[in-house]
Amino acid sequence: MAASVAWGGVNAGFLLRAARGAWWSRPGGFWGSGEAAAPAIARKFRATGSRPAGEEEAGGPERPGDVVNVVFVDRSGQRIPVSGRVGDNVLHLAQRHGLDLEGACEASLACSTCHVYVSEDHLDLLPPPDEREDDMLDMAPLLQENSRLGCQIVLTPELEGAEFTLPKITRNFYVDGHVPKPH
């Protein structure tokens, strides 16, 4: 019962049997050298990849229901419609579309540079901010009742049509002058 390396690679059981000098075909029987040996341990090898939370794959959403259309309003007042996926956070979505939402702490809840205003119609659809987000929002300039940190807003189907307005200014208390590169 040996497993193969993903995609037709080397059979792990074959390598183990060869190393031990026994060629087990099934439990209770063997081929090969004629020496008695313990059955080889079967291990599975898999090739896996990772996708950081909130990052869109090149192929786009798998199903149309995964798409959430939102609008960003930049500092000049220009409305910029964008499409994201369920599970994306607003900070990474804005950065992927070239919007000026800084995110100096790279979504670690250590700054307020991804501060946005959420449209009133959609604000109540978000879970309330936790204590750490509230602490960071306290340092955000131009704080309003509908202020939230973009890194903490995760897109859901209910946020279809939501507007996220960028405040006129932000303050980077994290590292003076540090501007991270989007992932």
UniProtKB/Swiss-Prot annotation:
Family in the record: Belongs to the adrenodoxin/putidaredoxin family.
Regions crossing the membrane: none
Biological processes, Gene Ontology terms: [2Fe-2S] cluster assembly; [4Fe-4S] cluster assembly; electron transport chain; P450-containing electron transport chain; ubiquinone biosynthetic process
SUPFAM superfamilies: 2Fe-2S ferredoxin-like
Subunit organization: Component of the mitochondrial core iron-sulfur cluster (ISC) complex composed of NFS1, LYRM4, NDUFAB1, ISCU, FXN, and FDX2; this complex is a heterohexamer containing two copies of each monomer. Form a heterodimer complex with NFS1. Interacts (in both their reduced and oxidized states) with the cysteine desulfurase (NFS1:LYRM4) complex; this interaction stimulates cysteine desulfurase activity, and serves as a reductant for Fe-S cluster assembly.
Major site of localization recorded for this protein: mitochondrion
Names of required cofactors: [2Fe-2S] cluster
Statement: the UniProt record of this protein carries the keyword Iron-sulfur: yes
Gene field: FDX2
Gene3D superfamilies registered for this protein in UniProt: 3.10.20.30
Keyword Transmembrane: no
Protein name: Ferredoxin-2, mitochondrial
Role description: Electron donor, of the core iron-sulfur cluster (ISC) assembly complex, that acts to reduce the persulfide into sulfide during [2Fe-2S] clusters assembly on the scaffolding protein ISCU. The core iron-sulfur cluster (ISC) assembly complex is involved in the de novo synthesis of a [2Fe-2S] cluster, the first step of the mitochondrial iron-sulfur protein biogenesis. This process is initiated by the cysteine desulfurase complex (NFS1:LYRM4:NDUFAB1) that produces persulfide which is delivered on the scaffold protein ISCU in a FXN-dependent manner.
Cofactor note: Binds 1 [2Fe-2S] cluster.
InterPro entries reported for this sequence: 2Fe-2S_ferredoxin-like_sf (IPR036010), 2Fe-2S_ferredoxin-type (IPR001041), Adrenodoxin-like (IPR001055), Adrenodoxin_Fe-S_BS (IPR018298), Beta-grasp_dom_sf (IPR012675)
Occurrences of domain 2Fe-2S ferredoxin-type (ranges): 68-170
Subcellular location: Mitochondrion; Mitochondrion matrix
Transit peptide feature range: 1-52
Keywords, in A-Z order: 2Fe-2S, Electron transport, Iron, Iron-sulfur, Metal-binding, Mitochondrion, Transit peptide, Transport
GO cellular component, one term: mitochondrial matrix
Molecular function per GO: 2 iron, 2 sulfur cluster binding; electron transfer activity; metal ion binding
Xref: Pfam families: Fer2
Residues reported to bind [2Fe-2S] cluster: 105, 111, 114, 151
